[in-house]
Structure formats: C-alpha cells, structure tokens
Amino acid sequence: MDALILQVNHLSKSFGTHEVLTDIDFTVDKGDVISIIGASGSGKSTLLRCLNLLETPTSGEILYHGENILRRGVNQAKYRSRVGMVFQSFNLFNNMTVLENCVSGQVKVLKRDKETAHAHAMEYLERVGMAPYINARPRQISGGQKQRVAIARAMAMDPEVLLFDEPTSALDPEMVGEVLSVMRDLAQSGMTMLVVTHEMAFARDVSRRVVYMNGGVICEQGTPEQLFSDPQKQETRDFLSRFRG
C-alpha cells in the first residue's frame, strides 16, 4: 500500500475578488511523480506556491501525514523544509558560489555543521553533473547549469517532496534536455515529485499521474495512458490537441 504524504481538501485561493483556485482535491503518495499540465493562467503555479506556503490558501486543508499544516500552532517552518521547491527562475544567490548556494540552507535551516553540509552538497552536485563548477558564481554558468544547481540545492535539504514550477520554461531549447534528464533520474530513484510543466513528453513518459487544470480547477486526472490516449473531457482533448503534430 502506498504511503500517503499529502492530502489536499477543498483548497481555494483568491487574490482580491479573483478566485484562482477553486475546490482543489488530490493526494500525493510516497514515490508519486505527478505532472500538472494546463494553459498559462490555469492556476498550476499558484497551487504549488500554496503547497509550499509561499501563498496562503483562502480556504481548505493541506494535510501532511494527516496534520493540517494550515492550522494555527503548526510548525510551518519544519513543513517547508520537508517540501522543497525548484523555481522557473532558479532563485540562486548571485553573491555565493555554486557550492555555497547548496550549503547555506542546510546550515541555516537544518542546523548542520558546515563539514556535513559541504559533503552533502557535493553528493548532489556530483549527481547533477555540476561538481566541476563548485567555485563558479551563477553569472558564470548557463541557464541549464543554474537549474541543475537549483535542483542539487533543493535535494541537499533532504525534502520528502520536491515541487518543480515550470523548471525548463526559462531555458534555451538546447538546455532543456539536460534538466529533464536530471529530473528523470530523480523520478527513477523514487523521489516524490510534483511538476508543473509544458513538457508533454516528460509528463507522458515519467509521471505516475497527470493532472490537467483549467480555470483554477482540476478538470481531469489519471495515468498518462488514460489522460493522453483516452481523455474523457472535451476541454482536455482540446488542450492536448495543440501538442500533437
């Protein structure tokens, strides 16, 4: 039986009078790789930002191992440290080296000693192929390399779940493959991942489940085979038809 990590119940989010998420329900089990697809403005990124508490939901519940992390008195900082996020724009510290970027959070948030944090950072920088660049600063490396560092930084925090917010959309086309390759390796290693993406081949080939969002709601979800080969709703078919040659 799969181990339930996250359960989202009736989640809604409004900015002023504009509701961007409406009554969202879904679950995340250990080892799940869930791709969230949909047109721009459908609420995908806002959903991830709510899960990471970068945005506060207007209503609903986010249960982490059965505990509602939106309830007053819950240690949200501890929760955030267990749910990592990789951003479209990398969000690296430009005044730090690659290695320092991957060490800083471990020391400040997890209270690791620098030697342990350094060794842990190197483990993941080697895994993403960035060990030769540990003394470089973000301005000295390519976009694809920055995103690989961002993934290593997130993994060095030992998250239980990793959220990816369109991790390849800011990259030049020739750099997309190197980042997707790292993400495939993570998925195959058993990392629990939620990925907002426009990379349909990745969603189809790597995901355990695909969620299609439109207008702030989950319109349809299922296995990649179900969603890509036999979508049940016309709006899902219309969206996917844009990606078929």
Question: What is the meaning of each model-derived region?
Answer:
Residues 3-224:
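ABC family nucleotide-binding domain
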Residues 221, 225-245:
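C-terminal boundary and immediately downstream tail of ABC-type ATPase nucleotide-binding domains
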